[in-house]
Every structure is written in C-alpha cells, then in structure tokens.
C-alpha cells in the first residue's frame, strides 16, 4: 500500500511540474475524455458535435504547439520525454495530417453507417501516440507510444467488419505489427545490455563509451534488428508486404490517415534512434538505409505500373516515396538533409491526402476503386478530375508543382552529401512514377465515349460551390500541392531551424 502511494505521489509530482511541456497532448486527452462522456451520457448521437469536438481539439493542440515554438529544449518526466524544435515540427505534421483526415471521413461514415464516436476516438488516440513517439527519449516510451498508434491503426483498418478484405487486412497488419514490435524490443535489449543498463538515448551513448562496447558485435546485431523493426513502420522494401493489402482492404479515409501519419511518426523516431545511440556506427546504418532506399524506389515504382486498383497503386507509390525520404535521413543535418526531408514530408502530406480525398469522393459516388473506371471522368466532373490530376502530377514531381521543388531540394542535398548513385536512382524512378501517373491522367481527360464505364456514365456531377467536407479538404490539399513549391524558401528556413 505504501509503495503504491509513493508511486502515485511521484506520478502526480511529475505531472504537476512537467505537465505544461505536454500541453498539446493534454488537449487531445481532454478531447478524448469529452467524446467518451458525451457518447456515454447522450441517447441521441449528434454527429456534427462529435466532429466539432475532434477538430477543435486538434486545432487547439496545433495552436498550443505553435505558441510553445520558441521555448528552449527541455527533457521532462525523468528523461522519458524531450521537447525541442525538431520533435515539435514532426508533432505539427502529425496534427496537420489528422486535422485534414477527419473531414475526409464525415460523408464516408454517414454513407457506410459506421460507428462515429469510436472512429474519432481511434483517430485522436493514434494521433496522441504519434505525438508522444516524436518526443520519446527512452526505450520504454519509444515502445509504448508506437504501440498506442499501432493498436488504433489495427482497429481502424478493420473498421468495416462485414468486409472480408478489411478483416484480411487487419489480420496481416496485426501479425506483422506484433512481429516487428518483438524484433524492436529484442534490439533494445542488446543496446540496454551493451550500454550498462541505460535506457535514455543520450545516456546510451555515454554508457557505450564507458563500457567500450560501441564497436562490439552486439551493437551491429541491435542495428540490424532496429532497422527491421522500424522498417515495418516506414514500410520500405522489403518490409512492404503488408502495405498493399492494408491499403486495399481498409476504409479509404483510414488509408489516407495511416499513409501519412505513420510515415511522419516513424521518420521522426528513426532519425533520432539512428543518429543518437548509433552515433559510432554511422557508416553501417547509412549502408543499410541506402539499400532500403534503393529497393524501395525501384520496387515501389515498378510494381505500381502493373496495378489496376487506385489504392494499391498508391500503396506501391508510397513505398517509392519513403525511399526519397530515407535520402534525407541518410544525409543528416550536415548538408540540410533533415530540412529537405521535413519540407518534402510537408508537401507529401498535401499531395497524398489530396489524392485520397479525390478517391474517397469518386468511390462514394460510383462504388468502385478500379483505375479503368476513371475513364472520361473529366466529361462528368472537371473539378474532381483536375484536382486528382494536379495531385498526381505533384506526386510525380512535375514543375512547377510543390512535389517538384520538394524532390529537387532533397536530391540536391543528397548530391552535395556525396550520394550521387542514390540520387541517380531517385531521379530515374521519379521519371518512372511520372509515367504511371500520366497514364491515369490521360484516362481521366481523354477517355472516349466507348471507353467510359457505367460508373462514370451514371456519375452525379457535383456543384461548383459545395459544402461537402471532403471537397473542402480536397481544395486545401490541392492548393497546398501546387502553390507552396514556387515560394518554398521560407518553408526550408523554418525546417532548418528545427535541427537538434
């Protein structure tokens, strides 16, 4: 009893003095509690009110994060959590992903008659897990935070319980996720033992120096296992097997959410884990990541060409895209690699969510996901066809769209760092990706009458000025995919200020 009281008092003391450092996260927790209270006490489900609470919580959390921006870096909760500009920019990106993803799900959930409260609870909880992962400073938090995110992801991917594909996707996702978590824990145990019992990232480096184990075989084993464990979260080749099935089987708004938030959170965690504990093994992890980047860029873009489903095509496209992001991780902060990675990640969020917004809208109006069924869409809905074309062109990296400038800066930083072969592969695979994106755009714009499928022939044209939340989110993403690329210097300057 005395021990329990002591533990409780210590936890209360930490929350009292360090709680202000996790104020954005506390806002999300309050939003979660409020959703649960309203859902459990109200007989009538007021759908707009639930969305208002969720969106307001996310916007308030973003505001609190921006107000905290200029504060000095701090380590809190007995070393478990670190607050600095680098972590905060990734937390901002995760909150931005969630804020844009919620409008995509409004009409979808109403049409499919899925439970609303639980869906929003899982979105907010996954966001909370991603934010804690960005600031995690010890092995316990690094393990618990992604598990919080992953468990919600499993539940969201299987949210349409009557859909066989959704159930299959959930099982694959769950089994692969459980295996990767166990591999990650095994890697942590090697680092824990080699450093003399340290669990904080910076203390592990000091421990390895004290024990003279920084060049031992145990560190190499830990590096391999951590690369495999984090590889599942980032889904580069060859850890990509789960990605196409989960993308195809999960509800489309869920795929939109997972396709960006998981990449952002895993990139933040991978950057800090590789850069701090494995400081003395930089050549080894650079080589491992280069192999993953090359495999991802080649396999992802090659297999994407053969796909007939839009969601599966975007799954393989995302595998190729993470290969570009890995270039920024390898370059590091010496040649602006982190700044270029963050900038490209920001553009990728808008490009990807904009594309998925178009897919959600088309799927709700036609009930199909097949690429051939998009033939002639421009004749029925020019606005949707043009929006989808702009997002796809930006993903491919055509000037003067944002994706072009993001890739250009990323590749230039890689070239300056001496990664000429890796950048050459990136350039070639980018050209390859433009090919299959242009195939879809040609289908959208020039589909002849005889090629137009019944899905598009019976398509209901949307009004030019719409109050549809999906279309509003789509407009925001399309604008963000085109305009920022022309004036990206301020974005790069802000990103460079985030280096830790």
UniProtKB/Swiss-Prot annotation:
Catalytic reaction(s) noted: a plastoquinone + NADH + (n+1) H(+)(in) = a plastoquinol + NAD(+) + n H(+)(out); a plastoquinone + NADPH + (n+1) H(+)(in) = a plastoquinol + NADP(+) + n H(+)(out)
Major location category of this protein: plastid
Single GO cellular component term: chloroplast thylakoid membrane
EC numbers, comma separated: 7.1.1.-
Cellular localization per UniProt: Plastid, Chloroplast thylakoid membrane
Single Gene Ontology BP annotation: ATP synthesis coupled electron transport
InterPro entries xref list: NADH-Q_OxRdtase_suN/2, ND/Mrp_TM, Ndh2_N
Membrane topology annotation: Multi-pass membrane protein
Pfam family, one: Ndh2_N
Transmembrane segments: 14-34, 47-67, 89-109, 114-134, 139-159, 173-193, 217-237, 285-305, 313-333, 344-364, 385-405, 408-428, 474-494
Keywords attached to this entry: Chloroplast, Membrane, NAD, NADP, Plastid, Plastoquinone, Quinone, Thylakoid, Translocase, Transmembrane, Transmembrane helix, Transport
Top-level enzyme category: translocase
GO molecular function, one term: NADH dehydrogenase (ubiquinone) activity
Subunit: NDH is composed of at least 16 different subunits, 5 of which are encoded in the nucleus.
Entry function: NDH shuttles electrons from NAD(P)H:plastoquinone, via FMN and iron-sulfur (Fe-S) centers, to quinones in the photosynthetic chain and possibly in a chloroplast respiratory chain. The immediate electron acceptor for the enzyme in this species is believed to be plastoquinone. Couples the redox reaction to proton translocation, and thus conserves the redox energy in a proton gradient.
Sequence similarity: Belongs to the complex I subunit 2 family.
Alphabetized PANTHER family for the sequence: NADH DEHYDROGENASE
HAMAP family in the record: NDH1_NuoN_1 (MF_00445)
Family annotation (NCBIfam families): NDH_I_N (TIGR01770), PRK02504.1 (NF002701)
UniProt-recorded name of the protein: NAD(P)H-quinone oxidoreductase subunit 2 A, chloroplastic
Organism per entry: Pelargonium hortorum (Common geranium)
Lineage of source species: Eukaryota, Viridiplantae, Streptophyta, Embryophyta, Tracheophyta
Gene (UniProt): ndhB1
